[in-house]
Amino acid sequence: MHVIRTVYNDDRESRGHVSKPLRFVTKAAPEHQIKGCYSPQARALGRQGGFQEQMNVSSFLNRPDTDDTLQNIRKEYLNTKRNLHDLLSSSPTRLQQGARGAGEMSGNAPPLHYVGGQAEPPQQGEQDDRLRQQLRDYMSNKSRSMPPPAKYPAPGPGPADGGVQRQLDSQKMMIESLKRELDTQRTINSMLFERLDRLEEEVRYVRHSNRAPANGAPFRSVSSAPSSSHTNGHVGSYASADDTKVLLGWDQPTLAHGGKHAQPPQQHTRTFSNLDDSTARLIQMSAGGKQKW
């Protein structure tokens, strides 16, 4: 057994539609509970009691004065809807701004227009204008609220620039090595120039010794000039060990042990001259340095 409850929907009346009754089905007591009674009379009384209870509940719910919760919700909803409709219909400018603000805050689609009780979407031109206006407002608000971009340090060279950086480092190392080699060459050149100056000085000495006999100065030949390297420590060795002075006539030989009975030293024939020896060494050193570098 079922009890049918009829409720009218008043919300659709504000939209111009005819209200249609809504039917809710309420179930009575289950049959197995009714069959569980001990006697047919008790079962009949149970059925009648269940029916009476269902009728009382349905009549209580159908009375609007007792259903305070549902009635209050309906009233609040209808009042709010009526106020919103009056507000939107009285101010077209505020309608557009309010719709735009609501769309920005909630992210919903623009509101629908009701024509003849049916919802119709807005025109394409109006929707484009609203979208453009929303975009302008968003960009202006973003430019005001956004702080200036933070400055980050420049990133280092990436993997693609690693080869270029290695080439630059290798070229710098080559330049440094070339600089060191240039400094070494400059040092060698300065040493060679110094040796050349000494060689020129020795050549001038030789020229002076060749011109000395013509001017009347004493002259000793290179072959007969005594040499301290061939005396081998005899008694009659010279006190001065510089044979070059004796060769050039700048010094006279003196006896190391003077006296009456002192015998003159035995002169040994020279096989080479100290001056020739030093000059030849300088020439060989200069030639060897040039060949080396």
Curated annotation (Swiss-Prot):
The keyword Cytoplasm applies. Residues 146-158 have a biased composition (Pro residues). InterPro entries: Spc29. One of its GO terms (biological process) is spindle pole body duplication. It comes from the Eukaryota. Keywords: Cytoplasm, Cytoskeleton, Nucleus. It is found in: Nucleus; Cytoplasm, Cytoskeleton, Microtubule organizing center, Spindle pole body. One of its GO terms (molecular function) is structural constituent of cytoskeleton. Residues 116-125 have a biased composition (Low complexity). Residues 87-165, 212-238, 254-276 are annotated as: Disordered. Its main location: nucleus. Disulfide bonds: none annotated. Signal peptide: none annotated. Component of the spindle pole body (SPB) required for the proper execution of spindle pole body (SPB) duplication. Links the central plaque component SPC42 to the inner plaque component SPC110. This is Spindle pole component 29. It comes from Eremothecium gossypii (strain ATCC 10895 / CBS 109.51 / FGSC 9923 / NRRL Y-1056). The gene is SPC29.
